[in-house]
Amino acid sequence: MNFLLLVLSCFFTFNLRAETAVYFTPSNACENNIIQLLNNAEQQIDIAVYSITNKNITNAIKDAHKRGVKIRILTDKTQASNKSAKASELYKAGLNIKVHTKHRIEHNKFVVVDGKAVMTGSYNWTSSATLKNSENCLKIWNDDKTVSDYQKRFEYLWEVNSKEKSDLWFELKAIKDMAKR
């Protein structure tokens, strides 16, 4: 009986250890691992990101949306108005996206997938971050507390930023973009 308890305690201890992986740029490591997380999502993706201009990541987000994954995106309003930003494209594709209006800057860079994994770090979701910048990202899984902390932070940020203000912001941006043509 004691032997069985020892074996079971080793099994549960082993499976409860947090796992992490660190990636650095310039290289495709951060981009590829974010895309892999998005592609493996089954239920929910929550993204808080300063800037998103990377076409490959944008396509992975849209693909997850098409698979029926619930997606919420919070991004910086100044960065979202950048001509190469993908925020308007994602908004037009029907994704639930808010521009950050509560604090001066939305400078987070994290994604929570299915309440099981987090990717965070300095990595902006841009081609420059992938190919030119010195950036990092950290993938965390099998760590319920850390993932829960990130999920709670996302929930707070989501609640304090108005969907109505975000919708109005995207509508005004569309009008400004049309006027420039």
Describe the residue ranges of each PLM region.
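Primarily the HKD phosphodiesterase
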Residues: 36-95
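Structural recognition of the beta-strand scaffold that forms the well-ordered cores
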Residues: 46-48, 72-75, 98-99, 111-112, ...
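Boundary/entry segment of secreted carbohydrate-active catalytic domains
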Residues: 19-29
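Solvent-exposed loop/turn segments at secondary-structure junctions
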Residues: 51-55, 77-81, 103-105, 117-118, ...
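Sec/Tat signal peptide C-region and signal peptidase I cleavage site
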Residues: 14-18
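Signature of lipid phosphatidyltransferase scaffolds
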Residues: 117-181
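Extracellular/periplasmic catalytic domains that process cell-envelope and extracellular macromolecules
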Residues: 39, 90-91, 104-105, 111-114, ...
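Bacterial N-terminal signal peptides
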Residues: 5-13
